[in-house]
């Protein structure tokens, strides 16, 4: 352990407290024996390809020629039998041939596109300055036609209620809407006149002259008076 401040540097064993004796550890129980692993079957090692040097290559190639078989250089062995069109002196004949590609069916000819009609270019609107505007406006007035300021040209004929100086652009004609069934005319509620004291006295005198009752709510004369009505009744 580290020295304490009261330890002497030259006396290492002095004043060290005695360590208490460790109690005896109980005996550990014995571990159960592990079951033996079953023996694994031996793995068959893949056969290693023989080393194919030039000497081995020539030897195997001659044997393949004698057997009329193709020489497989990658495996350094004889492969399938030669075909009649194989070359005997071709060193690369041991490559496996690619299967012939099936011939592609001919594509059907595309139908010719119908010639598109030439697009008519929209007529450009003439430049409508003040001078041009006045010129067309005078001509339209002479022809009794309305002046279309947007197109800077004369439009439809004027109607009797058109103003001579009207030069607003014509609105495009809207498609006619289907006629709606005629609705019965709604009777507008009569507006009650303003019935102040002056109006009240005026209408009341007129009702008395006509021998009719005065309707104060509507500020007008109502039905004729009956004999039992009071002269001063103003309901």
From Swiss-Prot:
Alphabetical GO CC annotations of the entry are: extracellular region
Entry keywords, A to Z: Repeat, Secreted
Repeat among keywords: yes
What is the reported tissue distribution?
Answer: Salivary gland.
Localization in the cell: Secreted
Top-rank lineage group of the source organism: Eukaryota
Main location class: secreted
Region described as Disordered: 1-133, 155-201
Q: Where is the composition biased (Basic and acidic residues)?
A: 16-85, 95-133, 168-201
Task: Name the job this protein performs.
Answer: Used by the larvae to construct a supramolecular structure, the larval tube.
Instruction: Identify this protein by name.
Output: Balbiani ring protein 6
Q: What is the lineage of its organism?
A: Eukaryota, Metazoa, Ecdysozoa, Arthropoda, Hexapoda
């Amino acid at each position: 352990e580290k020295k304490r401040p009261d330890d002497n540097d030259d006396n290492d064993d002095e004043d060290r407290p005695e360590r208490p004796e460790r109690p005896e550890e109980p005996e550990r129980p014995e571990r159960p024996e592990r079951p033996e692993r079953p023996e694994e079957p031996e793995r068959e090692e893949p056969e290693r390809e023989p080393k194919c040097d030039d000497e081995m290559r020539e030897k195997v190639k001659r044997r393949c020629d004698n057997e009329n078989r193709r020489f497989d250089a990658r495996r350094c062995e004889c492969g399938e039998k030669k075909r009649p069109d194989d070359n005997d002196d071709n060193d690369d004949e041991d490559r496996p041939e690619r299967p012939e590609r099936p011939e592609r069916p001919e594509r059907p000819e595309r139908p010719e596109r119908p010639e598109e009609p030439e697009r008519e270019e929209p007529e450009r609107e003439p430049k409508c300055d003040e001078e041009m505007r006045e010129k067309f406006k005078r001509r339209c007035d002479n022809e009794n036609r309305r002046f279309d300021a947007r197109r800077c040209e004369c439009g439809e004929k004027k109607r009797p209620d058109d103003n001579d100086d009207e030069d607003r652009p014509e609105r495009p004609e809207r498609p006619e809407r289907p006629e709606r069934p005629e609705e019965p005319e709604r009777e507008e509620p009569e507006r009650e006149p303003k019935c102040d004291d002056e109006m009240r006295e005026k209408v009341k005198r007129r009702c008395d002259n006509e021998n009719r009752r005065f309707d104060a709510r509507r500020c007008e004369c109502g039905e004729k008076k009956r004999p039992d009505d009071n002269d001063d009744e103003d309901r």
